[in-house]
């Protein structure tokens, strides 16, 4: 929820040294990082060192479903014991076709990944210019820190009711008490004007709620 990334090269080196298994959750990275959208592990050159990797088709790819990769022994074990796999039906052929088309399209559009990072970085800079407390990180996640659950929900409601901006409040137990925040993830299609409108709305909401910035 902070938008941080792990030190994958160092972790993989330790795993290799001590014969440990590496498991990586790439649901927030697949499609968005790496030259072809393969994820953060690919971007930092560690993809072939990950033993088990899971991702989703429901975020960057905009469809439904998910996946787990690994060697044949691992995958056979998962198929045998994972209740989430055993007690569900297979994905619709229509969804599979849509997912395949989306993966192919995202793979060929690194320009959107570059633009995505530019817009996220730009939003962080704009927020800092008006003293809105944004958590520093080097990813596309933009956490605006509030620090109070009731206030976080109130501010989220105000953004929607008064400015037509939907933002999900992130409260305990998703994050620790005292670190509640509004969480934004701008896309490549969010224009500079849209980012400006968001920042201005947040500035007004923070002021109306008498939150110190």
Question: Model-derived features: where do they sit?
Answer:
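Active-site core of PLP-dependent enzymes with the aminotransferase class I/II
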Residues: 1-19, 151-152, 193-194
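PLP-dependent enzyme catalytic core of the Aspartate aminotransferase-like
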Residues: 161-162, 174-213
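Active-site C-terminal subdomain of aminotransferase-like
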Residues: 18-24, 28, 33-138, 151
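Thr-Gly-centered strand-to-loop micro-motif
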Residues: 55-56, 63-65, 89, 144, ...
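Conserved PLP-binding catalytic core of the aspartate aminotransferase-like
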Residues: 2, 6, 114-123, 128-164, ...
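Alpha-helical structural signal in soluble globular domains
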Residues: 7-17, 43, 49, 122, ...
